[in-house]
Curated annotation (Swiss-Prot):
Keywords: Acyltransferase, Transferase. It comes from Caenorhabditis elegans. The lineage of its organism: Eukaryota, Metazoa, Ecdysozoa, Nematoda, Chromadorea. Residues 200-212 have a biased composition (Low complexity). InterPro entries: Atat (IPR038746), GNAT_ATAT (IPR007965). This is Alpha-tubulin N-acetyltransferase 2.
Amino acid sequence: MEIAFDLSTIFTDNIQRLTRTDLLKYGPKRYWAVAQSIDCLGEMSSKFHGWKRVITMYDKIVDHDEEQTTYIMWEKVNGSKSILKGLLRVGYKTLYLTDNEQNQYMEKAMCILDFFVVPTEQRSGNGFKMFDEMLKAENVTVDQCAFDKPSAALQQFLEKYYDRKDLVWQSNKYALCSNFFIGRHPTVPFTPRQTKRASRASSAVSSHASSRNTSPIGRNRPRHDSVADLMRQDMLAGVRAEVDPNSPTGLKNARDFGHRRIW
């Protein structure tokens, strides 16, 4: 993509690193080409990825609460013109993440927010040059990066140049290399849970054992005597103590039972 401005009057590198401070210094009133380069590349990136809105714009970057860094790949041509080849926007974000073992993390990661190479400049190694320059400048590795909604093209790029095949997808639409979690300690380690069926079975067994051993109903229930106990009681009832006829009890018995013993 060609722009009618000699970027060599502003930029010092063919892969120019621009912080928010740099972008504020190169304001659109005096350096309109900087804002226009970012806006044009951002619009092309959104169309290429099929996004509904443009996510990379000069105004959004300088007004954003979080610090972001933009890389522009360009080349000077004859006269006062330049060719724009690609754009890469990155920034640190605090993310809630989960690994393949369901351990949970809260990590501040370098996020790849927008990565685009102009179609006519693709298949020439420009994407790798720009991405590798970013890794060196930010002092990170590809395994330390989190990718925001990585496209199929970006996944192929990671596999081709960095041998990263299986990304770990997150509920927030970010994706990471599996090596991202090596050496990191989970905020919430995964704890296996019982299935509902196993939980119900365990509860039923516990309830049955408790009712047999500790139920108040079982403790207060009337005792049922055995047949042997009843026979023993009858035998004991047949044995009566001898009473002196002249004692009060003997006199009472004589009066009540016609002056004769009935047993």
